[in-house]
């Protein structure tokens, strides 16, 4: 809730970034935010509830199958599958931080989220997003070594290196999310508290702050949008160079490029721009928070014979094991 007689100008003159808990409480009178959600149409909400519940179920099942298959199959012991299992794990975690709340809100009349819950959601969203960005770079490097320098692949991508690269992804994602959250958490919010979105995101929150946030908007565009554009360009260029040197790698690179495009293009559309919001932002956010985590495991396993054979073997062991037990 927010205090209607709050004077934003007085607060802004007093302090922009509070340094103590007392100052923070004085400038922040909002304890919760109201989310307008995807739509106000009751029939559309019921339809979206069914669709998103199915998508979330498929996302969790698909990614869980990939993680279990890779971790239990000796045939999938190479670094590329180690990174793929980790990527599927992150996809499942990322989807679980957004989808359940969004699905639940489709059935509730008043969609609210506490201030601390909003900051937590913002942090987790950008944490997993940052981890996935770094992991996509790692997977591109792994693809380059495997295709262009196959004789040195197992030496270059040994267990220690793979573990270090994954640890770097975790640390990089944490630092990215921490910067984004600290950018928002100390801003003064004194009303209104209505977010025209289904999640807490940077630009909608910046618009609600009762201080000038144009500089912060530029920082977000640079830290998220420009960085995504730069990494996206590097990844696409890398895969093109791999294809130029090894045309036989077309199918492998095509799947990697598809995942990169599905991940980065929506992020670039949302963050690489001035601090303004559009109605289409919700649809774009739905795509990269709900749909993309479901598509990624399908794309990576669609024509991967080794993964499909390992899945068949796993299911055979499960079925025959159950029959033997019976």
Curated annotation (Swiss-Prot):
Odorant receptor. It is a multi-pass membrane protein. It is found in: Cell membrane. It comes from Homo sapiens (Human). Residues 1-46, 101-121, 180-216, 272-282 are extracellular. Keywords: Cell membrane, Disulfide bond, G-protein coupled receptor, Glycoprotein, Membrane, Olfaction, Receptor, Sensory transduction, Transducer, Transmembrane, Transmembrane helix. The gene is OR4C5. Glycans are attached at residue 29. This is Olfactory receptor 4C5. One of its GO terms (cellular component) is plasma membrane. PANTHER family: OLFACTORY RECEPTOR. The chain crosses the membrane at residues 47-70, 79-100, 122-141, 161-179, 217-240, 249-271, 283-302. Residues 71-78, 142-160, 241-248, 303-326 are cytoplasmic. One of its GO terms (molecular function) is G protein-coupled receptor activity. Its main location: membrane. Disulfide bonds join 118-210. PROSITE patterns: G_PROTEIN_RECEP_F1_2. Belongs to the G-protein coupled receptor 1 family. The keyword Cell membrane applies.
